[in-house]
Amino acid sequence: MSDCVLIQNLKVATVIGVLDWEREVRQELLLDLNLEWDQQKAASTDDVGYCLDYAAVSQWVISHLGGAQYHLIETAAEEIAQGLMKEFALLSIEVTVKKPGAIPEAEWVGVSIRRERR
């Protein structure tokens, strides 16, 4: 199956980084989410009640990351992937976490992970 819900460049402010100054400020992260979900019933019935609620997914991510502190974007990506898989019963997920301005020569740096239900 390859039905996916996509959320691109979700903006979340959180404490992230290993440098002393980074531990004292909130920085914006951008997240891309690729959520594998069985959309057949929603598509065949045209009923929003069978859809993955992407507003709820977005709010879960904003709430979770916004209330946390991380040293590594790798940790943030893993926690988001595991949490969303559990909370929304996803078949698989790909999470990309981008940190704008981390190095002056690049627009952003980031990590991307993919997790699947076993």
PLM ranges: what are they?
Residues M1-R118:
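N-terminal, polar/charged subdomain of small-to-medium soluble alpha/beta proteins
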